[in-house]
């Protein structure tokens, strides 16, 4: 018989830097999960990624207080900011442009995020990433 699901917890945790402090501790503590066990497992799974990169994670908590988790790819906005070398997007994206990304960088980001994105082809995924870039005040160069 399958385990009974108690809750799903969605968090963004820095790769390789999960610790019991907020937001991880309170979110998992409410569900009765062993927080240190999650932190060790998450850090082990994300050790190959760049340290500090925010990684979305969905934690499935079961009625017997055990858990499983699925890590996703970093948000497109974070990858775009890293590619453009900027700290934050524009407050007025249509007026103030804050940086540039090339089509090759957009393709690379789309390929990185391919597993977590909808869209039939890499081109449709690239259009989605390019739209995110424009909404952040980045210019997409061909």
Swiss-Prot record:
It holds the Pfam family Ribosomal_L11_N. One of its GO terms (biological process) is translation. It comes from the Bacteria. This is Large ribosomal subunit protein uL11. Forms part of the ribosomal stalk which helps the ribosome interact with GTP-bound translation factors. The keyword Ribonucleoprotein applies. One of its GO terms (molecular function) is large ribosomal subunit rRNA binding. Belongs to the universal ribosomal protein uL11 family. One of its GO terms (cellular component) is cytosolic large ribosomal subunit. PANTHER family: 60S RIBOSOMAL PROTEIN L12, LARGE RIBOSOMAL SUBUNIT PROTEIN UL11M. One or more lysine residues are methylated. Part of the ribosomal stalk of the 50S ribosomal subunit. Interacts with L10 and the large rRNA to form the base of the stalk. L10 forms an elongated spine to which L12 dimers bind in a sequential fashion forming a multimeric L10(L12)X complex. Keywords: Methylation, Ribonucleoprotein, Ribosomal protein, RNA-binding, rRNA-binding. The gene is rplK. It comes from Haemophilus influenzae (strain ATCC 51907 / DSM 11121 / KW20 / Rd). InterPro entries: Ribosomal_uL11, Ribosomal_uL11_bac-typ, Ribosomal_uL11_C, Ribosomal_uL11_C_sf, Ribosomal_uL11_N, Ribosomal_uL11_N_sf.
């Amino acid at each position: 018989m399958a385990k009974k699901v108690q809750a799903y917890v969605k968090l963004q945790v820095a790769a390789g830097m999960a610790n019991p402090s907020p937001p991880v501790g309170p979110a998992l503590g409410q569900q009765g999960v062993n927080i240190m066990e999650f932190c060790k497992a998450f850090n082990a799974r994300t050790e190959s990624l760049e340290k500090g990169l925010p990684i979305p994670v969905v934690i499935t908590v079961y009625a017997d207080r055990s858990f499983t988790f699925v890590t996703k790819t970093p948000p497109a906005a974070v990858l775009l900011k890293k590619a453009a070398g900027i700290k934050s997007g524009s407050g007025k994206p249509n007026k103030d442009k804050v940086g540039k990304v090339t089509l090759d960088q957009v393709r690379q980001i789309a390929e990185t995020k391919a597993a977590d994105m909808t869209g039939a082809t890499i081109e449709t995924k690239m259009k989605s990433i390019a739209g995110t870039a424009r909404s952040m005040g980045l210019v997409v160069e061909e």
